[in-house]
Amino acid sequence: MSVGKRIYLKREMPDPEIMAQFKTIPASNTADVMNRSCAMNPRIHLVSSPKEQMMVGPAYTVKGRAGDNLTLHAALNLCGEGDVLVVSNEEDNTRALMGEVMMAYLRYTKKIAGIIL
């Protein structure tokens, strides 16, 4: 039996005041306090020069297969302002998940806080 794709339209949002407080805490300290249970792989690193030092927001997560960005296209319409789009594609680095048009749409139209690929 195939599981198929699942898209959840509702999610519980964190308190905005708590999210704002995370802008003052280094990510490494947060990971240490949480027993590193929510830490990302160290191969994930900054590849741009953001105007702000901290990228903080509720995560909008997307899991897809290598070479398949259908769930990512759905996320383009579902994520909102201030969200951090977190995309997993089974660690495939042979194909691009998104290009300049999608990035510009997320940044300027959707006004998300950032993207983690």
Predicted segments — roles?
Residues 1-63, 70, 77:
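Intrinsically disordered, low-complexity regions enriched in acidic/Ser/Thr/Pro/Gln residues
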